[in-house]
């Protein structure tokens, strides 16, 4: 992108582009093979059964090898989940994705939620000329954000690699969880909206520094716990009440997002239960599960290559996830077929790093990783247990 809050970074796909991509892949690649049947608009009921939302028709599938269950960690989003608070009659309340379709202009906007959806809703409003003074942001927790500058692929991958090496050095030297986050913030790896409030939430969401500058214009920020009820003239929270009005639009961004169910083995005789096993990069790591299933013989060995972890929510979860990544990478690198696929896959964000070996940033980062990698793994384990 050349302009806007994403200037200098690879473009961000919108909802329509994402849907069009999956439709194209399904209809141009999968269905023509004759090996795939597609049942859109259905809900999985368990035990190989799914039901159409449109007609109520149901199907029972005989699983010949394994059922791949991606619903186990299925999260909730505002578009498909009702608000986790009461909404009185006469109150205007819409999920985040509906604010673009509002026809009657509200006097004010109240954005409810502390995560990425709420952040994006605030940025969207500000970018379209809504005055910061017309926005109230209710957030029960303050969050850390990953700097988009260090999350870019392809021609910008040297900065991603440099950012990873900075994290590893900080992880080797930190004396506590708070000290680690302070070091990463000082290096620009992590960002926060309000420098005066210490974040307690970290879900790995990404933002840019220009977006952050926009968000800091919002001064009406309410930190009184979770919203319990919206009445026509007031919003009831855990720790008090703030006024509202029928002419205010309340934007629901408070869905629970990523699920954190009890961990279970990913590979079992009759099923593959999709769960994270490394930090970030969902497309890469979940594709890697398919490679492991296809190239590794025994379930015990498969599970040893990718023991599951819970999705991250608190600050300390970042340490646990990164430790799992460092340990798991070493184990998977020792398996030839898995290592070869990982090295060549375009889903691997650093698969093209070899093309930049002469870049001084890459050479410096490689030396930093060699120097601090082992110490980082040991210290992360210690800090996570203490934190």
State where each predicted segment sits:
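C-terminal active-site-capping segments
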Residues: 323-387
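Glycine-rich active-site loop/strand segments that organize a redox cofactor
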Residues: 1-24, 138-194, 200
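Extended alpha-helical coiled-coil/bundle linker/stalk regions that scaffold oligomerization
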Residues: 231, 236-299
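Glycine-rich dinucleotide-binding loop and its adjacent helix/turn
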Residues: 8, 14, 18-21, 69-129, ...
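Short hydrophobic core segments
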Residues: 59-76, 109-112, 245-257
